Regions:
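Conserved catalytic-core motifs of GNAT/GCN5-like acyltransferases
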Residues: 120-122, 135, 140-154
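Short amphipathic helical patch at the helix-1/turn junction of helix-turn-helix
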Residues: 90, 124-125
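Acetyl-CoA-dependent GNAT
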Residues: 3-8, 23-93, 104-106, 110, ...
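Structural motif
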Residues: 114, 132, 136-137
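Conserved G/P- and acidic residue-centered "switch" motifs that form tight phosphate/ATP-binding loops
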Residues: 98-100
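Terminal substrate-recognition subdomain of acyl/acetyltransferases
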Residues: 1-14, 152-165
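Short glycine/proline-centered loop/turn elements that form peptide/ligand docking sites
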Residues: 104, 127-130, 147-152
Length: 165
């Protein structure tokens, strides 16, 4: 994904205005905090955490936005040998339209560009949509664990090497 790209898969929900994938900017912080709250409720990141990942150069934050409305975001820490996808949030009204798949494909491409051999992420065990998306894209459960009273799964995808995809 380029820094700025028009997003086309069924993106015109209420208007003909296209959604665009681009890097997050500091001006997006209120929208990112709100998107995180809508998607993750009590487990949402603090405004300070969002400020850090948007401003710090080692993090990559990609948003899909229609005008000023941020409808999805991913937060990636590209590194080798393993890259971590720290968050992938899609507003409920934009789910099942290819938005999450676009952000996941972008994360995979960025991890490969960082020479990572693995891409890892964590997902709640009671989030079948996210688990299904990740499985379809080649992720497998590496471990299950209890965190803050919720069962979660670490999922990983091998990106290259002798047995990689």
């Amino acid at each position: 994904m380029a820094c700025q790209k028009t997003f086309t898969p069924d993106d015109a929900l209420d208007s003909g205005q296209p959604a665009v994938a681009r890097f997050a900017r500091p001006a997006d912080l209120p929208a990112l905090v709100e998107l995180d709250r809508v998607c993750f409720a009590a487990r949402a990141w603090s405004p300070a955490a969002w400020r850090e990942v948007v401003i710090e150069p080692e993090w990559t934050v990609v948003v899909i936005a229609r005008g000023d409305l941020v409808v999805a975001a991913s937060v990636l820490l590209p590194a080798a040998p393993a890259t971590h996808l720290a968050s992938l949030a899609v507003h409920p009204r934009w789910r099942r339209r290819g938005v999450g798949r676009e952000l996941l494909a972008d994360a995979i491409a960025r991890a490969r560009a960082a020479s990572a051999r693995w891409l890892a992420l964590e997902v709640d065990r009671d989030n079948p949509g996210a688990i299904s998306l990740c499985r379809r894209d080649g992720f497998a459960v590496a471990r299950r664990f209890l965190e803050d009273g919720r069962w979660r799964q670490e999922m990983v995808r091998r990106l290259g090497g002798r047995h990689g995809v």
